[in-house]
Curated annotation (Swiss-Prot):
Top-level taxon of origin: Bacteria
One of the Pfam families matching this protein, by short name: GHMP_kinases_N
Gene: thrB
Keywords of this entry: Amino-acid biosynthesis, ATP-binding, Cytoplasm, Kinase, Nucleotide-binding, Threonine biosynthesis, Transferase
BP GO annotations: threonine biosynthetic process
Record pathway: Amino-acid biosynthesis; L-threonine biosynthesis; L-threonine from L-aspartate: step 4/5
Entry-linked InterPro entries: GHMP_kinase_C_dom (IPR013750), GHMP_kinase_C_sf (IPR036554), GHMP_kinase_N_dom (IPR006204), GHMP_knse_ATP-bd_CS (IPR006203), Homoserine_kinase (IPR000870), Ribosomal_Su5_D2-typ_SF (IPR020568), Ribsml_uS5_D2-typ_fold_subgr (IPR014721)
Gene3D superfamilies: 3.30.230.10, GHMP kinase, C-terminal domain
PANTHER family: HOMOSERINE KINASE, HOMOSERINE/4-DIPHOSPHOCYTIDYL-2-C-METHYL-D-ERYTHRITOL KINASE
Reactions catalysed: L-homoserine + ATP = O-phospho-L-homoserine + ADP + H(+)
UniProt name for this protein: Homoserine kinase
Subcellular localization: Cytoplasm
Enzyme class (EC, first level): transferase
UniProt source species: Staphylococcus epidermidis (strain ATCC 35984 / DSM 28319 / BCRC 17069 / CCUG 31568 / BM 3577 / RP62A)
Length: 306
């Protein structure tokens, strides 16, 4: 019998405006992986979607490098593997494609190295590698997650927030915006006054989400001062998306992660008309309705006749 590990790993959106590097939500776009042992010297990567075209198929592959680094950390040896991949998560668009790949690599190392890491331990490891939990936490656990990574203790603490009863619209531009380029425009420091103000906005946003006060939550999301004022000029379509969304009574329009994808939260009864309007008025972008993934990464082992 041939043993195959199958992974279904969700996309994620980070920040929700003012929750910079600490709040994220899993979405129903996925990286699908099928992994099996092979009797060869080198790993084999097979890609079955356009989103993955151009990715390395050798030792420069990020999943390969990450899985081997984890194996070394726990003093185990991984067999040669064949990894089949299919994805509808666009790369470098602010939808957590790198976090999905990272989580996939951790699950591969954990299973084929028989390391026996719990989900909590996988989160700790993922956040230590990534530097913050905003994408990896919802990717692993699903839902809407707030978290903090302490770089001194190297411990990540997370709390789950009830998933908001709203519809999500993604407006995805045709161009990439790499995280390192998007971070380059951010200031190195904030004044104490500015930090206090943004902290107050973030606190209010979280409380409003918990109480299902989505208008208030959206108002807070759109008052972010941590990153959006510095990044909006990198996304020419942003202001028009926000303007159209407000005309359709959306709760908030924010940058998804480092961008350039634009995330809109809106009432369920308004979402269909809004997404059609966005498709018509901003036709160089792909606008679509998505739902919130509440379970995180799904892993299963299947056995096939050899």
């Amino acid at each position: 019998m041939e043993e195959v590990l199958k992974l279904k790993i969700p996309a994620s959106t980070a920040n929700l405006g003012v929750g910079f590097d600490s709040i994220g939500m899993a979405l129903d776009k996925y990286l699908h992986m099928s992994i099996r042992k092979i009797e060869r010297a080198n790993w084999e990567f097979l890609y079955y979607s356009s989103e993955l075209e151009g990715l390395p198929k050798d030792e420069n592959n990020y999943i390969y490098q990450t899985a081997l680094n984890v194996a070394r950390k726990y003093n185990v040896t991984l067999p040669s593997l064949q990894i089949e991949m299919r994805s509808d998560i666009p790369l470098a668009r602010g939808l957590g494609s790198s976090a999905s790949a990272l989580v996939g690599a951790l699950f591969i190392a954990n299973y084929f190295g028989n390391i026996q890491l719990s989900k909590y331990e996988l989160l700790q490891l993922a956040t230590e590698i990534e530097g913050h939990p905003d994408n990896v936490a919802p990717t692993i656990y699903g839902g809407l997650i707030a978290g903090f990574y302490n770089p001194i203790t190297k411990i990540t603490d997370v709390a789950r927030i009830e998933v908001p009863h709203v519809d999500i619209i993604l407006t995805i531009p045709p161009y990439e915006l790499r995280t390192e380029d998007s971070r380059r425009v951010l200031p190195d420091t904030f004044s104490h006054k500015g930090a206090v103000q943004n902290s107050a906005i973030s606190n209010t946003m979280i409380c409003a989400l918990i109480q299902h006060k989505y208008k208030l939550a959206g108002k807070m999301m759109e008052q972010d001062g941590f990153h959006e004022p510095y990044r909006q000029h990198l996304i020419p379509e942003f202001n028009q998306v926000r303007k159209l969304s407000r005309q359709h009574d959306a709760y908030a329009t924010v940058i998804s992660g480092a961008g350039p994808t634009i995330l809109t939260l809106c009432p369920k009864e308004k979402s269909g008309k809004l997404v059609r309007t966005l498709r018509e008025k901003i036709n160089n972008c792909a606008s679509e309705l998505v739902t919130i993934n509440e379970i995180g990464v799904k892993d299963e082992v299947v056995y096939l006749k050899s």
